């Protein structure tokens, strides 16, 4: 398995990671970076899609871990490259995305998941786990392939008493750790 970050490392924002296996690509998050004062006239900064342009037809889906702009803000721009890429996420995150896509006049294929769900997209077997964050409905995704297991957590916090009662699934994280 090859893992390529297209944004989000050593910066706060533009989160986007590509997982490659068996000739197929799975993307986790597709966010924007908000410019600072040394970027006058710039509204937002996108991940660099050039790595994907020759392989758009190999993308099996985009998993969105939660609804913050630094994780979902680039989705309309990716879908302008290929509009039928499935967007995979929790109910609230998909609601945010649908509203954002309406502004761009894009209709997306969406797949709603919840914690505990397992879904297969190409060679990727995905398992979704609850995470707590400053926005409801956050999820981590365990990505299984013939090469092994990777856990992509997105952003999360360790709050044992969140307002919505939904805590990070530490038992699930431990189980995945035992699995390897």
Regions found by a protein language model. Name each.
Residues 1-63, 68-180:
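His/Asp/Glu-rich metal-coordinating catalytic cores
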